[in-house]
């Protein structure tokens, strides 16, 4: 297995009904039967990176911060929406246009309202990503995650898609393959 530098692994989630002491006892007692049964379950898996692990991948962090509609459109395209432009433009319009209207109409009082519109739209893609890769609904529900941490959420989704597709890259995540043209000759008409 190849080790990655800067690869963040989020801590395991502890259910509210379980204490930290119970978790330590379970993790310090290795049992082969438990390991085998856990690997065969269909329990949701953890995300490959945490919601706040944006700085582990500076490229997606910068693009997600300065042009979130691009990352969102790329995520939607890789999840099977069939197009990049539709989700990208919808995200851009729902974020920028509604934000501008709310800001000017209320003198800045409802500046956070557009987050609700974007969250309603984006949480559907997060849900389909979780279903596709059997991921936990963490750190919160899909809507709440996008409502409070939208930029971090789309960067996390982008990192997850890239991590899951490593080794079997989709066509648009690697360099284009160009074949040389066939040799051609010209013949005279005489």
Swiss-Prot record:
It holds the Pfam family PLAC8. Signal peptide: none annotated. Disulfide bonds: none annotated. GO terms for cellular component: membrane. It is found in: Membrane. It is a multi-pass membrane protein. PANTHER family: DUF614 FAMILY PROTEIN-RELATED. Belongs to the cornifelin family. This is Protein PLANT CADMIUM RESISTANCE 10.
């Amino acid at each position: 297995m190849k080790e990655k530098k800067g690869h963040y692994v989020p801590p395991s989630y502890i259910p509210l009904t379980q204490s930290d002491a119970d978790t330590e006892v379970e993790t310090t007692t290795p049992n082969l039967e438990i390991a085998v049964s856990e690997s065969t379950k269909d329990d949701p898996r953890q995300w490959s990176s945490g919601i706040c692990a944006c700085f582990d991948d500076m490229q997606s962090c910068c693009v997600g911060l300065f042009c979130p509609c691009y990352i969102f459109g790329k995520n939607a395209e890789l999840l099977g929406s069939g197009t990049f432009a539709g989700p990208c433009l919808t995200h851009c319009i729902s974020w920028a246009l509604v934000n501008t209207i709310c800001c000017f109409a209320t003198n800045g009082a409802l500046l956070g309202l557009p987050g609700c519109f974007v969250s309603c739209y984006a949480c559907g893609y997060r849900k389909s990503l979780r279903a596709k890769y059997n991921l936990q609904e963490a750190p919160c529900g899909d809507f709440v995650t996008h409502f409070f941490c939208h930029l971090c959420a789309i960067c996390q989704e982008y990192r997850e898609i890239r991590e899951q597709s490593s080794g079997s890259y989709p066509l648009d995540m690697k360099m284009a393959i160009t074949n040389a043209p066939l040799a051609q000759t010209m013949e005279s008409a005489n």
